[in-house]
Amino acid sequence: MSKSMTRSFLGLLLAASLPWGSGVGAETLDVSDPDQALLAGNKLICANTPGEVSLYWWQGVVYSRIPGEKDRRLFDVQGMNVRQCGRFEDEVRGLGFRSVSREVMLYLDPETGEVLDTWDNPWTGETVEVVHVHNDPVNSRAVNWSRDEEGNPRATFEPDLVINGTVLRGGGAARLFYNNPLAGDYQDFEGGKYHATEFLTMAYPLEDALNAEATAIQDAVISWGRISGWLPWMKMRGRTGIMVHYTHGMRLFDWADLPAVLRDEIEANYPTFMAPPPVDDDRPNETTWTVFKRIVDDKRASGEWPEQSAR
């Protein structure tokens, strides 16, 4: 961080202790205290009040990239994540939060904007059934505590970049590489592991994070991207190439703020996803790959789809 940016952040922290902006007269969190630092940071993830539901939405485009050919715009997407946080307190570890959520992302026809039921694969010529993202749950694996097992401070709130009172957060990547539930037991030898990289950038008012009376940072905008292999329902059968997701979105105030195409589809076909799981939800997380595996297994068990041949 440059010295000018450091001074800017320190100046904003000092200014936040004074009556200014929409937080006139509001108490300010002391982020040198790990409990209060956690309160400031958790506002972006969900809300600090138990039972308060948070809703994030995004929209964007999915492109293909295959060596030797022009990138194609395959789909538009509309997505949302609905979540809440459980709040915990411990004599040694201090304050803690754990988020629980469900998420939906729809694949749309890039020409008409309509939700796709089937898709004509331009490389194989096959018409395939579209499986939209409907992951339930997408939870934090453990409680995020303000202190470690020995009571030492763990949580911090130190934004890297603040410009004109706005925190810009991003620049890193989630580099995902783990066993693919659709592959076999020999992935360490033959390959086939799930391999992707995800990027998330967020911007929000520093004042909202430091306002002790605010339970959440409502004015947050996001940009999410992913580079990955083909989606399993596309039936690409190992063809060379990758997919690039590029989206932008924001935190919404209410369910009614979702675009109609997304809201209507969830209400009609994914009503469970209108609310987050309970805070004590201990189910394993789902991904597109685990959901698709279950769909394939169910269809094969019912005879709707044939078993894969031995050759």
Question: Can you name each region flagged by the protein language model?
Answer:
Residues 19, 42, 113, 125, ...:
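Short, flexible coil/linker elements and helix-boundary hinge sites characteristic
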Residues 68-209:
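Predominantly extracellular/secreted and cell-surface proteins with exposed
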Residues 167-311:
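A eukaryote-biased signal for long
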Residues 1-10:
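Bacterial N-terminal signal peptides that target proteins for export
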Residues 2, 19-22:
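C-terminal cell-surface anchoring/sorting signal
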Residues 10-20:
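Bacterial N-terminal signal peptides
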Residues 26-107, 245-256, 260-264, 272-311:
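N-terminal segment immediately downstream of the Sec signal-peptide cleavage site
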